[in-house]
Amino acid sequence: MPHRRSVGFIETLALVAARPVVALSSLEILAEAEAEAGWPVLAVVDARRGEVFQQRFGPDGAEGPPVVGRPEGVAPGPGDSQPVVVGGDGADRYPEWYGAELRPGREPSAAVMVTLAGQRPAVPGHLVAPVYLRDPDVHINVTTRHTPR
């Protein structure tokens, strides 16, 4: 199910069931699954179109916002002196750009998601908003759409 519909579905379930929700990103879940003492984690998801979604995490959580871009523009460079564990299908797809300690085949884990959710405050479903790293693929031209024929 595409991301935009998934968030709407969860909001609807929360409203109907009168239950709160916990907002987590797949990058956070990947990072937690790869976390090792003292090593930062770079979570990388294949965004298609030759791009990746990625975010760096340290022992205290995210070290910056998630980004989207071509691997050669967002992957760690040779000047990065600190070792990093890289996880996610984006790193698998572009191994030439992610030469760190690579953990192939990782996907967000339901067990890790449940653990993280237990550590976060729950909020009403209508307060959870998706984070979009790029614009939608389709835009409706309202003027054209509502012109009588």
Explain the meaning of each model-derived region:
Residues 19-109, 125-126, 132, 137-148:
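Surface "functional belts" at beta-alpha junctions
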Residues 8, 12, 29, 112-113:
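Short amphipathic alpha-helical face segments that pack within enzyme cores
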Residues 105-119:
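Short, flexible loop segments at boundaries between secondary-structure elements
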Residues 1-21:
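DPxDG-like acidic metal-binding loop motif
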Residues 8, 14, 34, 123-125:
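Generic hydrophobic alpha-helical membrane-segment signal
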Residues 14, 97-100, 116:
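A near-ubiquitous, low-amplitude feature marking generic local secondary-structure context
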